[in-house]
Amino acid sequence: MLLLNKKDIEKSVDLDGMMDQIEEAYKIFESGAYYMPPRPTVEHDNKTLIYMPCYTKDSLGTKMLTIFPENVSLGLPSIDGLVLMNDPKTGKPLAILD
């Protein structure tokens, strides 16, 4: 499985290619050719965990966010997240993007 952190992603981004992918994502959105269920959210003790899954014929991914407001007092971000990408045919984990 591929693990990419912020620096890895920044080094590998092709802005022209990224714009092409964003345009493709808008086409998929406009056509309705995706499945994105309501976001499961877990809230406890002023902390929040949110899952944002989405599935198309060519991709399967889940964005996970945590919201911990008290982290500010620790010098940490109050919102953290990552994306898990899976093979859309087998479900096998392919990559984690931090």
Name the predicted role of every residue range:
Residues 1-97:
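N-terminal ligand-binding/catalytic initiation module
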